[in-house]
Amino acid sequence: MVLFTDQNRKELKRRFRKDLKKEILFSLFTTNSSLLTIPGRECPDCPQAQELLEEICALSPKIDLKIYNYFDALESRRQYDIDKIPAIVTESEGANRLVFYGVPQGYQFPVFLEGMERMSRDVSSLANTTRKGFSKVDRLVTLRIFVSSNSITAASVAKLAQAAALESRLISAEIIDVNGFPELRRAYNVS
């Protein structure tokens, strides 16, 4: 399945050539695709997440992808603190990591790309007073943002959470697509 049109690819290639300075690594936690599904190990969004990242990686030599089988990569799961799939960890040298649970699509896709680009450029989108405020954080904080692909408000909040995480190593941002995790939607009463 092709996710991007030729025009989309052309625009993204241009954008990545211009905006990516440092290399980006995506670590995808997924399951092995198989015709046999083991109960409790289903992940209907995993193939789409992998396909999306593979298409993005094909657009720039500065973007790489490492794929982990969630059920086999216990040490890596602990290292990245991953507890559900699909999980996309975005990293770049010298920057804090960003985590997206699910498939970044709809309004979340541009936020996903902007986070990656800001990370690669070491550029903050925050005002200096806000940056100073985040520099005063003195303990670990996890910002868990629940989003859906059709919510522009959630996209704005996710963008701010990513900016905060890129500002301080003590702040981590987890963006969670509630459409892919209905049990979390119910548990946290997300509408």
Predicted regions and their residues:
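Local sequence-structure signature of Cys/Sec-based thiol-disulfide redox active-site neighborhoods
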Residues: R14-L59, F134-R169, A173
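N-terminal leader/targeting and pre-domain segments
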Residues: M1-L25, F29, Q108-D138
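N-terminal, well-ordered alpha-helical segments
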Residues: P47-E54, E75, P86, P110, ...
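Catalytic cores of large soluble enzymes that bind and process phosphate-bearing ligands
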Residues: F4, R41, D45, P104
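Generic structural signal for well-ordered secondary structure
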Residues: C46-A49, Y70, D81-I82, Q105
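Thioredoxin-like thiol-disulfide oxidoreductase module
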Residues: P61-G94, L170-S191
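Non-catalytic, surface beta->alpha helical segment in thiol-disulfide oxidoreductase systems
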Residues: A87-V123
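Short, surface-exposed acidic/glycine-rich loop or hinge patches that mediate macromolecular interfaces
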Residues: F71, V103, S148-S151, V178-N179
